[in-house]
Amino acid sequence: MNKTATCELLLFVSGEAGLTLTELSSLTEMSKQACQQQIDYLKEKYHSDRESALTIIETAGKYRMATKEDFSEILKNYAKTPLNQSLSKSALEVLSIIAYKQPLTRIEIDQLRGVNSSGVLSTLRAFDLVEKVGQVEAPGRPSLYATTEFFLDYIGINNLEELPEIDESRYVAEQQTLFNESEENENQ
């Protein structure tokens, strides 16, 4: 199998998280030096290819694929166009959680929802409704997410205080009812 293509594939599928040289080396069973050579080759290849919108960047010791800065406006315009369509229920749920409880980590969102929210968060970030606003000083340094100025414009409010109040006790009661019904169905 082609070493360059293997590194390129792994950088692509790692997405926003990226990979360290150690991780890439472990996944490819190549030395760190060999992985670095492949990354350097890919960086140069993308840099010199004026027909490609891709590049490889290094941030905090992790390598990831990204779009070249020249294409940022096109990407922003693309990301915003699907807003003419409706957001999925999952996206609306995550957006609501973030709007009312921000800032919070993906893990906190996952715990509130009971399912993984990575994909939905990526979608909301691509739509510029949610952004990373910092990191928690804890192992792994998880990112904190909050809504954007565009979110306020999109829903037509000036600040978060204008969000309608929610009755959390009603929400908790509804969740408990659903849980009890689910348990009853499993016991039958």
From Swiss-Prot:
Q: Which Gene3D superfamilies match?
A: Winged helix-like DNA-binding domain superfamily/Winged helix DNA-binding domain
The GO cellular component terms are: cytoplasm
List locations, semicolon-separated: Cytoplasm
Which keywords annotate this record?
A: Cell cycle, Cell division, Chromosome partition, Cytoplasm
In the record, the note on similarity to other proteins reads: Belongs to the ScpB family.
Quote the function comment for this protein.
Participates in chromosomal partition during cell division. May act via the formation of a condensin-like complex containing Smc and ScpA that pull DNA away from mid-cell into both cell halves.
According to UniProt, the name of this protein is Segregation and condensation protein B
Supply the gene name: scpB
